[in-house]
Amino acid sequence: MQAKIQAILQSREILGKEPRVYMQGYDIPELSARLFPVKTQNGLYLAVWSGEEKNVFERPSLVWREKDEVCAVYPFSFSNYLRLTRFLAHLKPSPFNHHPSFGCGDRLGMVSAAHLKALKEFPVFPVIAQQSPRELQKTRRSFADVLLGAAWGILESGYQGTFGADADHIKDEQDLLEARDLGYSMFTLDLSEKVNYRAFAMDERELSRRYEEMNAQEQEVFGRYRDKKFTLSLGVEVDLSEEKLLPLVLAYLPAVEQVEYWYHLLREELSSFDLEISLDEGESITSPEAHFFMAEELHRRGIDFRSIAPRFPGVFEKGIDYIGDREEFSRALWTQVAVARDIGGYRLSLHSGSDKFSIYPIFFRETGGLFHLKTSGTSWLQGVAVVAEKN
C-alpha cells in the first residue's frame, strides 16, 4: 500500500503541488480495486489502483502502469461521485435515525471532516450537507457543490456511518426539485412567506367579511376545529374557540396547502425522506394553537413530516449566544414540546443554533433529547479567524 501511495505522490506534475493521499484508502471488491482520495492545490481526485483500467469513472486526469497494476486518477466531479456511491453506499445521504440530529452547515465546503470528527463521540445523527438557496447565492455555490463537499469530508475522515443532506429554507419549487433530483435526504420548507400573518391584525369587521368570503375548503377546515379545546398531557391548553380559530385558519391554511403540494412533488421520486416545517422566520412567535393546527392538519392530509421549527421568543443570531430571557424561552419551549409529544411522530427543531450555549441544556432537557439542531455560522467564522491569523 505504501508503494502505491508513493507512486501517487510522485505524479505531482499532473495533480499539482503538495498532493495529500488519505492513507486509509477504500477497498472496492466489485472492481478488484483500491481507491485513494487525493487532495491537491489543483483540486480533489480519486486514485484507483487495479489489475486493469476500469471504465467506471469519467475523464481520467492521469493513467500509468506500475508492474502488473494500473493506477487511474479521476477528478472528484459530481458525476464521478454518483458512480462511486454504487460501491460506497454510505456516501449517499439517508433520512434520520432514532438519535437526535445535528445539522452542520459548511459554508466553505472545507470542514465536513472536522464536523464529523467533532460529532463522532456523541449519539447524534449528523446532517453534514446543509445550505439554503440564500446561502448558496452569497457563497456562489450550488446544491451539488454542497453535497460533493460533504461526501469528500466522509472520504477524508474515513467515516463509515450514515449522514443527512438538508436542502435548507426552501421557498420555491425550482430549488426543491433541484435538491430532490440530486439525492438530498432532508427538505426544510420555509413557510415565512406562505403564512398570512396579516390575518392576526384584522379587526372584527374584516374578519367577519373574510368569514363570509370563505371558500368550501376553508369552511370545511374551519368547521372541523371550531370551538374545540384541548388539554394536553403536560397541562398545556390549546384554545380553538371561534375568535381564535378564524385568523388561525386564514393565516396558516395557505401554508398547509403549500406543504401538501411540495410533499407530493417529493413523493413522486422519493420513497423515504425527512421533511421539516420551518416557521422560525415568521413575523410572530409560534403559539401552541398554531403549532397544533399545522401539525394536526398536515397529519390529517397524510403528510409525514419529521420535524418542525417554531419561532421562539428571543433573538437568534448566527455565531453568538441566545439573546433573551431564558425562563421565557423555557416556558415557550414547554408548550411546543407538549403539542409535539401529544400529536407525536416528529421532533422539534432549533434554527440558528450556533453557539447558543445558554439554552442548549434547556432544549435538550425539555425535548427529552429528541430534537434537531441547526448550526452554520461558527465554522465559517472560525475559518475567517484562521485566515486572518495566518495571512
Which positions does each model-derived feature cover?
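A generic local structural motif
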Residues: 151-152, 277
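Short, conserved phosphate-binding/catalytic loop or strand-edge motifs used
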Residues: 273-275
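Active-site cores of enzymes that catalyze phosphoryl transfer or operate on phosphate-rich substrates
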Residues: 190-196, 201-259, 317
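Active-site capping/gating regions of soluble enzymes
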Residues: 1-149, 155-157, 173-195, 200-204, ...
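N-terminal glycine/serine-rich phosphate-binding loop of ATP-dependent small-molecule kinases
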Residues: 164
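Conserved, mostly hydrophobic/aromatic
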Residues: 168, 277, 351
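Short glycine-centered, acidic/aromatic-flanked micro-motifs in structured strand/loop junctions
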Residues: 279-281
